[in-house]
């Protein structure tokens, strides 16, 4: 019987700020952001097989085609780089919204790389996994690294940070925001002055995509206008999700209980060390 390994977390991230500093000659945007994890996300289970086939099961009603699925792409990339002839059957319990700015797809890919590297006993170090992850998406290395980070460049230059770990109320507006559309929009601010590590004070944190997305998606604007009545609030990534910062779990839960019925949301704890790091330490 092949080995089964259960309950690998693929946590969400929040961009505590997102500043766009300019546009590079290759068309990519130069940015600065601060990534922090939260104790809420997707879950993956793995059954290791002796043959190289890969199968993915999911609780989603709409399954992403295999050719576009980041979980399968991650597993295949790992096989390709290492020559591994083992395979896996993978179960995804999807809890994070797609197009929400919480990094769900990138986190799923990162957890797949980290878990299969361990379960296939490949022995790649974190840097090698991050290099593979970067070929799958700009945010994947953040989740592999597993530590809250100040990111620069196109998001690939990471410096560990130790910031407060508050409770968050995250709202999920009924909107799917295209990251590509946001970054291509002519009205997106692209000239925010750069911060350095010594000036990462929260009063300077903002999201340069927020005004544009709020104008285009009234669901996002409505969520922000409601949430800001209870706590300092802003959008994560290019949206659509927004978050408010609370001093206690109780305060966040009390606000959640008052949210309008048409809004979805959850309460989660900010974490400077990813739950994936903690899961790996249990092996």
Curated annotation (Swiss-Prot):
Reactions mediated catalytically: 4-CDP-2-C-methyl-D-erythritol + ATP = 4-CDP-2-C-methyl-D-erythritol 2-phosphate + ADP + H(+)
PANTHER family referenced in this protein's UniProt entry, alphabetically: 4-DIPHOSPHOCYTIDYL-2-C-METHYL-D-ERYTHRITOL KINASE, CHLOROPLASTIC
EC number: 2.7.1.148
Described function: Catalyzes the phosphorylation of the position 2 hydroxy group of 4-diphosphocytidyl-2C-methyl-D-erythritol.
Entry keywords, A to Z: ATP-binding, Isoprene biosynthesis, Kinase, Nucleotide-binding, Transferase
SUPFAM superfamilies on file: GHMP Kinase, C-terminal domain, Ribosomal protein S5 domain 2-like
Classification via Pfam families: GHMP_kinases_C, GHMP_kinases_N
GO molecular function: 4-(cytidine 5'-diphospho)-2-C-methyl-D-erythritol kinase activity; ATP binding
The protein, known as: 4-diphosphocytidyl-2-C-methyl-D-erythritol kinase
HAMAP family: IspE
InterPro entries the UniProt entry points to: GHMP_kinase_C_dom, GHMP_kinase_C_sf, GHMP_kinase_N_dom, IspE, Ribosomal_Su5_D2-typ_SF, Ribsml_uS5_D2-typ_fold_subgr
Pathway, per record: Isoprenoid biosynthesis; isopentenyl diphosphate biosynthesis via DXP pathway; isopentenyl diphosphate from 1-deoxy-D-xylulose 5-phosphate: step 3/6
Residues annotated to bind ATP: 97-107
Disulfide bonds: none
GO BP term (any one): isopentenyl diphosphate biosynthetic process, methylerythritol 4-phosphate pathway
Protein's UniProt keywords contain Thylakoid: no
UniProt family annotation: Belongs to the GHMP kinase family. IspE subfamily.
Catalytic machinery residues: 13, 139
């Amino acid at each position: 019987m092949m080995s089964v390994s259960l309950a690998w977390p693929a946590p969400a991230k929040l961009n505590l700020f997102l500043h766009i500093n300019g546009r590079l000659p290759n068309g990519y945007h130069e940015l600065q952001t601060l990534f922090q994890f939260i104790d809420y996300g997707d879950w993956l289970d793995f059954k290791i097989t002796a043959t190289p086939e890969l199968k993915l099961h999911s609780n989603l009603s709409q399954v992403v085609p295999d050719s576009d699925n980041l979980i399968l792409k991650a597993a295949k990339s790992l096989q390709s780089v290492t020559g591994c002839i083992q395979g896996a059957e993978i179960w995804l319990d999807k809890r994070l919204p797609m197009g929400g700015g919480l990094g769900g797809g990138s986190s799923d890919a990162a957890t797949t790389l980290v878990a299969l590297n361990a379960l296939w006993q490949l022995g790649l170090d974190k840097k090698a996994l991050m290099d593979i992850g970067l070929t799958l998406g700009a945010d994947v290395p953040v989740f592999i690294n597993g530590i809250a980070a100040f990111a620069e460049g196109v998001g690939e230059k990471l410096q560990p940070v130790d910031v407060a770990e508050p409770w968050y109320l995250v709202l999920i507006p009924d909107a799917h925001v295209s990251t590509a559309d946001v970054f291509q929009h002519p009205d997106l601010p692209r000239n925010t002055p750069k911060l350095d590590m010594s000036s990462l004070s929260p009063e300077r944190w903002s999201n340069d995509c927020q005004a544009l997305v709020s104008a285009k998606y009234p669901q996002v604007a409505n969520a922000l206008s409601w949430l800001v009545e209870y706590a300092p609030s802003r959008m994560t990534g290019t949206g659509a999700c927004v978050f408010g910062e609370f001093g206690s779990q109780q305060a966040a839960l009390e606000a959640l209980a008052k949210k309008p019925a048409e809004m979805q949301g959850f309460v989660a704890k900010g974490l400077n060390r990813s739950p994936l790091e903690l899961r790996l330490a249990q092996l």
